């Protein structure tokens, strides 16, 4: 491992010990905001420290085994060779793990996020599939102990949604779900299809991190057009007799957000503004990222309809991720929320891309 990386790791261990000491300070314990921030930093540093400690131990084990290999006793030398082999494997594995732990962290990864699903091409079947996707993400959230809160839902006439927005509350929600942004295509025989023909439909998914209040950009009141209307259910059926639903248009960007889930106009407006802020910030970040990495592939989907990331083929029971050429034949498990087998390989590929970028820059 390079000397510069070892120096950085030693500095992180020093900081870990410093934070550990600070967490026992009565002054810090009395300041809840500071205590919370340091506790979070401590848990992040702990993983690196433990891994680096194991790496140094493996290095010591290798030196000891190499000394043992110089012994006159043949049995001891044979044992030493086995220990040398094991120590070298451990050093290689731990060095790779440390490199990943040292990769730049996305500050948004630990945050809650907004999940937006829109039915695309495919008529009624696209709306039904949007409902299936929401159920899939809800099941995944449940498995991770996260909470999902529907912000706005425009139900489709034959089930599912024309579009819907939900907030996912949970540690690391954005970090796990951010690679879900993009076009999701389904191939299956619709329930209404009498000839048994396979139809192709599509939905788009967009994942946006929740923006903390302190980081929300200033949005001028003059830049907003706010409309109120009566919230309605599927098929236009009114479910509220007051104009509590809110539609906010951000005039400079043309971004439109609707929220009609709450009976209170004030609550709907607050929810819509939170989603609007997330969309504006994400659009700015996506623009910056595109300018920086025109040539580098980006596994983070844009949420654009043309940006197809995954196909769900029901007749074959398969799911394919087109970004990394991954196909698994576990469709029913995936639709029940077992998304880890799809998410983990994309995260690993993303980390490999980051490592390659670092190698190019060094």
UniProtKB/Swiss-Prot annotation:
Keywords: Cytoplasm, Methylation, Protein biosynthesis. It comes from the Bacteria. Gene3D superfamilies: 3.30.160.20, 3.30.70.1660, 6.10.140.1950. The modification N5-methylglutamine is found at residue 237. Its main location: cytoplasm. Signal peptide: none annotated. One of its GO terms (molecular function) is translation release factor activity, codon specific. SMART domains: PCRF. GO terms for cellular component: cytoplasm. It is found in: Cytoplasm. Disulfide bonds: none annotated. InterPro entries: PCRF, Pep_chain_release_fac_I, Pep_chain_release_fac_I_sf, Prokaryotic/Mito_RF, RF-1. Methylated by PrmC. Methylation increases the termination efficiency of RF1. Pfam families: PCRF (PF03462), RF-1 (PF00472). NCBIfam families: prfA, PRK00591.1. Belongs to the prokaryotic/mitochondrial release factor family. Peptide chain release factor 1 directs the termination of translation in response to the peptide chain termination codons UAG and UAA. HAMAP family: Rel_fac_1 (MF_00093). This is Peptide chain release factor 1. It comes from Vibrio vulnificus (strain YJ016). The gene is prfA.
């Amino acid at each position: 491992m390079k000397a510069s990386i070892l120096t950085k790791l030693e500095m992180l261990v020093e900081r870990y010990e410093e934070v550990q000491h600070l967490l026992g300070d009565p002054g810090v314990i009395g300041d809840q905001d500071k205590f919370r921030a340091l506790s979070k930093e401590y848990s992040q540093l702990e993983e690196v420290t433990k891994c680096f400690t194991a790496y140094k131990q493996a290095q010591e084990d290798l030196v000891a085994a190499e000394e043992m290999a110089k012994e006159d006793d043949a049995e001891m030398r044979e044992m030493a060779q086995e220990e040398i082999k094991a120590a070298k494997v451990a050093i290689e594995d731990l060095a790779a793990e440390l490199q990943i732990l040292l990769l730049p962290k996305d500050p948004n990864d630990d945050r809650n996020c907004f999940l937006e699903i829109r039915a695309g091409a495919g008529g009624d079947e696209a709306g039904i599939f949007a409902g299936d996707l929401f159920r899939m993400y809800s099941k995944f959230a449940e498995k991770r102990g996260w909470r999902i809160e529907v912000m706005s839902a425009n139900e489709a006439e034959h089930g599912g949604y024309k579009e819907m927005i939900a907030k996912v509350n949970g540690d690391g929600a954005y970090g796990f779900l951010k690679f879900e942004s993009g076009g999701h295509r389904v191939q299956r025989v619709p329930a209404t299809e009498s000839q048994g023909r396979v139809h192709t439909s599509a939905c788009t998914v967009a994942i946006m991190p929740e923006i903390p209040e302190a980081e929300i950009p200033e949005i001028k009141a003059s830049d907003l057009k706010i409309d109120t209307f009566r919230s309605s259910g599927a098929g236009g059926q009114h479910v509220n007799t007051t104009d509590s639903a809110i539609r906010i248009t951000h005039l400079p960007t043309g971004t439109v957000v609707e929220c009609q889930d709450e009976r209170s106009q004030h609550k709907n407006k607050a929810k819509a503004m939170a989603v609007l802020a997330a969309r504006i910030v994400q659009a700015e970040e996506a623009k910056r990222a595109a300018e920086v990495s025109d040539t580098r592939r980006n596994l983070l989907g844009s949420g654009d309809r043309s940006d197809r990331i995954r196909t769900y083929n029901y007749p074959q029971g398969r799911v394919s991720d087109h970004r990394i050429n991954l196909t698994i034949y576990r469709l029913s498990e995936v639709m029940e929320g077992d998304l880890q087998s799809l998410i983990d390989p994309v995260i690993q590929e993303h980390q490999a891309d980051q490592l390659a970028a670092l190698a190019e820059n060094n």
